[in-house]
UniProtKB/Swiss-Prot annotation:
It catalyses: glucuronate acceptor + UDP-alpha-D-glucuronate = acceptor beta-D-glucuronoside + UDP + H(+); calcidiol + UDP-alpha-D-glucuronate = calcidiol 25-O-(beta-D-glucuronide) + UDP + H(+); calcidiol + UDP-alpha-D-glucuronate = calcidiol 3-O-(beta-D-glucuronide) + UDP + H(+); calcitriol + UDP-alpha-D-glucuronate = calcitriol 25-O-(beta-D-glucuronide) + UDP + H(+). It comes from the Eukaryota. InterPro entries: UDP-glycosyltransferase, UDP_glucos_trans, UDP_glycos_trans_CS. SUPFAM superfamilies: UDP-Glycosyltransferase/glycogen phosphorylase. This is UDP-glucuronosyltransferase 1A4. The chain crosses the membrane at residues 492-508. Its EC number is 2.4.1.17. It comes from Homo sapiens (Human). Pfam families: UDPGT. One of its GO terms (biological process) is heme catabolic process. It is found in: Endoplasmic reticulum membrane.
């Protein structure tokens, strides 16, 4: 250290003590959590872990039948009854995920997708009804005096509950269908350069892509109604007055968006929108002896991590065998999260596991590639750790995520329905052997990590902020209080247009009057002149 920068140790210790003593620590608060099951919960769980470490209490509300939400030390789990069993739930979920790999006629696939969407929507709504009509539980929640509700607005039940209990809400979200996030924040959303969800458009669109971008919401209007309208009806019933979907999504004090401008395209944001992309990369842990042994045995070739997310762990036999054949043709050891029937052609370099520490494996320097369904959870772990991807998107925003990463040169996208064993083999060899993929993902990783505050700390800060101040009304734009024609200034435009037209009309009338006067006078002069000459 330079002589001029040296500080005596006692003085340094005293300074640090003073700094800590004036730090505005939040008092212990109570957080009510209404999560969405699946990978969104896995990210939210990290925020709850940190809130617990800072002295806050969290209560997680969940149906007693679910996929991943189980009791843990850093929160209290409160489960409520639903009219189906775990076996029924698992069977239906497996049926949905198996359908991702079935080749069907376009209309049949669309029809099946609509049926799935409708069934999922009905199930979520039924869960919400069971929760809100559980009078004993609602009384208990009301008496507990929670400081904030943390919820994922993909399931609007959390918004209904927060509004019903009059507790400030923080939304923890990645995407909501039907642009409800833009409507809930009153954030500008021009279709000219902000691609709509599920379109796979970029922010630089051709004319036809802009046409598609504008018309796509109309095509999804049925899905939007199916997805959101039941919650508005339920809220209207509870409040005994008309409540719209926009009223529900506008209730949030702060929106914690699990994205950033490394993965997402530049777009406008509002003051109460906070970007926490990569929050799930926090709290990395050392690998167990089992996985360390797999990596050590891989030698100089390293490993490939293969997981299709929290929902998909079984694949139809024919497709599984094609995948296994491709995996056997690369020199790397493949760790494949898979619980289905073991493919008969599984090679010696491929190890099937029921669970794997995905983020910790991706963070190991011997990991060469990541085979993923391109969910935002996995994509961010790939970005955080700088691992190129082979992406096999299955549903939802995964197609958009894959398109963005492929455009940025961070991976290769395969159509899971059409890909062959050779396609997967070539894609793996490309991302492993072509240095450009590694360089591109490392560049994205460097950009993502170059930030003043870690995403987890930022998320926890804003939850504590809302608890301390009982909301954030100063961040709420006045646009929420305008009618649609006021928002677009149509009344002002109409008024100014009327003024211009009125002035133009008066000017025209004056000119016409003056013209007639002048013309009449000139005519009389000519007539008088003619009479004199005669």
């Amino acid at each position: 250290m330079a002589r001029g920068l040296q500080v005596p140790l006692p003085r340094l210790a005293t300074g640090l003590l003073l700094l800590l003593s004036v730090q505005p620590w939040a008092e212990s608060g109570k957080v009510l959590v209404v999560p969405t099951d699946g990978s969104p919960w896995l990210s939210m769980r990290e925020a709850l872990r940190e809130l617990h470490a800072r002295g806050h209490q969290a209560v997680v509300l969940t149906p007693e039948v679910n996929m991943h939400i189980k009791e843990e030390k850093f929160f209290t789990l409160t489960a409520y009854a639903v009219p189906w069993t775990q076996k029924e739930f698992d069977r239906v979920t497996l049926g949905y995920t198996q359908g991702f790999f079935e080749t069907e006629h376009l209309l049949k696939r669309y029809s099946r997708s609509m049926a799935i969407m409708n069934n999922v929507s009905l199930a979520l709504h039924r869960c919400c009804v069971e929760l809100l009509h559980n009078e004993a539980l609602i009384r208990h929640l009301n008496a507990t005096s929670f400081d904030v509700v943390l919820t994922d607005p993909v399931n609007l039940c959390g918004a209904v509950l927060a509004k019903y209990l009059s507790i400030p809400a923080v939304f923890f979200w990645r995407y909501i269908p039907c642009d409800l996030d833009f409507k809930g924040t009153q954030c500008p959303n021009p279709s000219s350069y902000i691609p709509k969800l599920l379109t796979t458009n970029s922010d630089h669109m051709t004319f036809l892509q802009r046409v598609k971008n504008m018309l796509y919401p109309l095509a999804l209007s049925y899905i939007c109604h199916t997805f959101s309208a039941p919650y508005a009806s339920l809220a209207s019933e509870l409040f005994q007055r008309e409540v719209s979907v926009v009223d529900l999504v506008s209730y949030a004090s702060v929106w914690l968006f699990r994205g950033d401008f490394v993965m997402d395209y530049p777009r406008p944001i509002m003051p109460n929108m906070v970007f926490i992309g990569g929050i799930n990369c926090a709290n990395g842990k050392p690998l167990s002896q089992e996985f360390e042994a797999y990596i050590n045995a891989s030698g100089e070739h390293g490993i490939v991590v293969f997981s299709l997310g929290s929902m998909v762990s079984e694949i139809p036999e024919k497709k599984a065998m094609a995948i296994a054949d491709a995996l056997g043709k690369i020199p790397q050891t493949v760790l494949w999260r898979y619980t289905g029937t073991r493919p008969s052609n599984l090679a010696n370099n491929t190890i099937l596991v029921k669970w794997l520490p995905q983020n910790d494996l991706l963070g190991h320097p011997m990991t060469r590639a990541f085979i993923t369904h391109a969910g935002s959870h996995g994509v961010y772990e790939s970005i955080c750790n700088g691992v190129p991807m082979v992406m096999m998107p299955l549903f939802g925003d995964q197609m958009d995520n894959a398109k963005r990463m492929e455009t940025k040169g961070a991976g290769v996208t395969l159509n899971v329905l059409e890909m062959t064993s050779e396609d997967l083999e070539n894609a793996l060899k490309a991302v492993i052997n072509d240095k450009s993929y590694k360089e591109n993902i490392m560049r994205l990783s460097s950009l993502h990590k170059d930030r003043p505050v870690e995403p987890l700390d930022l998320a926890v800060f804003w939850v504590e902020f809302v608890m301390r101040h009982k909301g954030a009304p100063h961040l709420r734009p006045a646009a929420h209080d305008l009618t649609w024609y006021q928002y677009h200034s149509l009344d002002v435009i109409g008024f100014l247009l009327a003024v211009v037209l009125t002035v133009a009309f008066i000017t025209f009338k004056c000119c016409a009057y003056g013209y007639r006067k002048c013309l009449g006078k000139k005519g009389r002069v000519k007539k008088a002149h003619k009479s004199k000459t005669h």
